[in-house]
Amino acid sequence: MQHVFIIGSRGLPAKYGGFETFVEELVTHKQSADVYYHVACLSDKEHHTHFQYAGADCFTIKAPKLGPARVIAYDMMAINYSLQMVKKEQIAHPIFYVL
């Protein structure tokens, strides 16, 4: 199983366009059962909760409201949490796709 972590979009389902639509199209048109997507989702309320969307593991990150710097904090927090998941679940050779 190839685990792919997608970081940098606001999450799923797509509500904004651009990166979000790309991620939704990628996840919903997956061609191989051997690929498993983990998608970071920006949240104002929840932190480190998981839900399934179109077969992908979506996890929430509640980044602090820092104005334009919020997206940088969000990316860093999502990468850190993803690395924790990789270590905890002993995922070999994960792929990180940072948008």
What are these regions (language model features)?
Residues E24, T28, S32, N80, ...:
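Short, well-ordered alpha-helices that flank and scaffold nucleotide-derived cofactor binding pockets
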Residues F19, V71, D75:
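Conserved donor sugar-nucleotide recognition element shared by glycan-biosynthetic enzymes
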Residues M1-V4:
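Extreme N-terminal starter segment of soluble prokaryotic enzymes
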Residues F59-K62, G67, I79-L99:
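Short N-terminal targeting/anchoring amphipathic segment
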Residues K15-L26:
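Conserved alpha-helical elements of sugar-nucleotide-dependent glycosyltransferases
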Residues I7-K15, H29-A69:
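N-terminal strand-loop element at the rim of the active site
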